[in-house]
Curated annotation (Swiss-Prot):
Lineage of the organism: Eukaryota, Metazoa, Chordata, Craniata, Vertebrata
The UniProt record lists the keyword Nucleus: yes
Compositional bias (Acidic residues): 187-215
Keywords: Acetylation, Adaptive immunity, ADP-ribosylation, Autophagy, Cell membrane, Chemotaxis, Chromosome, Cytoplasm, Disulfide bond, DNA damage, DNA recombination, DNA repair, DNA-binding, Endosome, Immunity, Inflammatory response, Innate immunity, Isopeptide bond, Membrane, Nucleus, Oxidation, Phosphoprotein, Repeat, Secreted
Residue positions of motif Nuclear localization signal (NLS) 1: 27-43
Organism: Bos taurus
Record InterPro entries: HMG_box_dom, HMG_box_dom_sf, HMG_boxA_CS, HMGB
One Gene Ontology CC term in the entry: plasma membrane
Biological processes, Gene Ontology terms: adaptive immune response; apoptotic cell clearance; autophagy; B cell proliferation involved in immune response; chromatin remodeling; dendritic cell chemotaxis; DNA geometric change; DNA recombination
Record's protein name: High mobility group protein B1
Family: Belongs to the HMGB family.
Length: 215
């Protein structure tokens, strides 16, 4: 979020993010000169959050609601700089980029890891999944790679149809040139979108964690 337009409204924070921020401020007041081990600190915050009552979490949930309202209000009046509009505001009707083989693997094994190690932080779960994938034999990776390839093939057909529908003249002209630049662009976008997918997952995991605790 450090990149891009400095005038863009700050992203909305979850109740858990407000809680972690408060913990960090408390820690700084008590130990102003101490360095913070991030993974250790995150683990302690996660454990403390799980033991909190719904009433204690209430103030952070109120802060999150107020921040969400602030973000939505500011986004209504925000005008992105030229050239950024296309990237920042994606068409909801556009075909969704397919998941990678690793992402499909994570979707299958994440619930198992969370079930076996409920105390693990989101970062530790991601690290464990990365280790598991690296230690998985090439033959065992094949089903995920085949599925990812099929989904990518479908996506390419869908996106070609979507682009042709949106720009009929462009579909007739310069197809060969467009294909070359498209491939390069998609390779770059793949990396960005995998990061987006991981961020989305982290947010989902955070919300799941909060929902589980509220129950």
């Amino acid at each position: 979020m450090g990149k891009g337009d400095p005038k863009k409204p700050r992203g909305k924070m979850s109740s858990y993010a407000f809680f972690v921020q408060t913990c960090r401020e408390e820690h700084k007041k008590k130990h102003p000169d101490a360095s913070v081990n991030f993974s250790e600190f995150s683990k302690k915050c996660s454990e403390r959050w799980k033991t909190m009552s719904a009433k204690e979490k209430g103030k952070f949930e109120d802060m999150a609601k107020a921040d969400k309202a602030r973000y939505e209000r500011e986004m209504k009046t925000y005008i992105p700089p030229k050239g950024e509009t296309k990237k920042k505001f994606k068409d909801p009707n556009a075909p969704k980029r397919p998941p990678s083989a690793f992402f499909l693997f994570c979707s299958e094994y994440r619930p198992k890891i969370k079930g076996e190690h409920p105390g693990l932080s989101i970062g530790d779960v991601a690290k464990k999944l990365g280790e598991m994938w690296n230690n998985t034999a090439a033959d065992d990776k094949q089903p995920y790679e085949k599925k990812a390839a099929k989904l990518k093939e479908k996506y390419e057909k869908d996106i070609a149809a979507y682009r042709a529908k949106g720009k009929p003249d462009a579909a007739k002209k310069g197809v060969v040139k467009a294909e070359k630049s498209k491939k390069k662009k998609e390779e770059e976008e793949d990396e960005e979108d995998e990061e987006d997918e991981e961020e989305e997952e982290d947010e989902e995991d955070e919300e799941e964690e909060e929902d589980d605790d509220d129950e």
